Amino acid sequence: MHLQYYAISIVSLVSLIDCHKLAFNFNLEINGSDAHSTVDVFLDDYQIITFDGKDIRPTIPFMIGDEIFLPFYKNVFSEFFSMFKRVSTSTPYEEDLTYYYECNYTNNKSTFDQFYLYNGEEYTDKTQEVTNKNMWLTTSEFRLQKWFDDEDCIMHLRSLVRKMEDSKRNTG
């Protein structure tokens, strides 16, 4: 009985240790003639990096001084938004476009999720009409996958988790 209880406990702990998520939240705000882009990167629901359209900054101590991920992500995010140069800013109303992409690694299985928001509401409708909303929906995934695909996400997730755990061991 006790052996069975310990076996279940160990399996549960391994499952918790083996569950991680890396998420990217791309945002493009259009207000009249002004457009502003941002990206927030999360590891296990903790923001680790922020990009303001020009500069990238670590938001958690273990990412300070990073020479691998920060330059790479700055390049990816800059390229991602540079492809939206033709975005229409002549609309008289505000547009808030969000593309959310995440990869999860749980119980030795990779899963991926993504969704799109327009002014805070999820949308999936593709039409032939050329609008910022349709352009964002039809090209965001392609633009990210050009530089960073699902397999890359899992590799980065594992590396960032290792970096986080090493930092905890070295400071704790």
Language model feature labels by segment:
Residues 2-172:
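Extracellular/lumenal regions of secretory-pathway proteins
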